[in-house]
A protein has these predicted regions:
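Intrinsically disordered, low-complexity charged/polar segments
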Residues: 1-24
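Catalytic cores of nucleic-acid endonucleases
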Residues: 9, 32-33, 93-144
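Residues at secondary-structure transition points
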Residues: 39, 43, 47, 72, ...
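Conserved catalytic cores of phosphodiester-cleaving nucleases, focusing on short active-site segments
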Residues: 56, 75-79, 83-97, 114
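Short acidic/glycine-enriched loop/turn segments that link adjacent beta-strands
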Residues: 71-74, 146
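Protein kinase-like catalytic core scaffold
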Residues: 73, 85-87, 135-137, 151
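Short, low-complexity, polybasic intrinsically disordered segments
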Residues: 140-157
Length: 157
């Protein structure tokens, strides 16, 4: 299978990063699976979150938690950024952007719940970690035939 591994972005945001580097071995395997049109939405979401975590690690982030649940909802990924800021990362994976950009699915209501869940995560005794700040990021993945677009928006809200 020939695959276009150029990762591009179609959204603009101050501080946003887009991957244009060729993927490393583990990410390359996930690229093929992300482009598999037979994946069910839940499978696509789980694979997208794994891809996002690996992508962020490749960019210097350290995983602190994954799929952490509170009464306000789930935090997809909690990471320590290279500048020692704790980043709560909401991942949105789609097959198309025909119905809008994936980040548009992070509504004001969702943002409020993510903030509340983030506060709860920080208050957990096991999560007392030296850090310089906190932010909420959105990382979007659009996977369509042969191409995966990754767009990371630090401090999205």
């Amino acid at each position: 299978m020939v695959m276009d591994t150029c990762l591009t972005s179609r959204a603009e945001h101050a501080g946003a990063t887009t991957d244009h580097d060729p993927p490393v071995a583990g990410l390359s395997d996930m690229l093929c699976r992300l482009c598999d049109g037979s994946l069910k939405p839940k499978q696509l979401g789980v694979l997208g979150e794994q891809y996002a975590a690996d992508w962020l690690e490749r960019h210097g982030y350290t995983i602190l938690g994954r799929n952490w649940h509170s009464r306000y909802g789930e935090l997809d990924i909690v990471m320590m950024a290279p500048d020692r800021v704790i980043a709560f990362v909401e991942v949105k994976t789609r097959r198309t952007d025909h119905f809008g950009m994936p980040q548009e699915a992070v509504t004001l209501h969702k943002q409020t719940n993510l903030r509340r869940a983030g506060v709860q995560w920080l208050l957990e005794p096991d999560h007392r970690i030296r850090h310089t700040g906190v932010r909420f990021d959105v990382l979007t993945i659009v996977a369509r035939a042969g191409m995966v677009s990754v767009h990371h928006i630090p401090g999205a809200f």
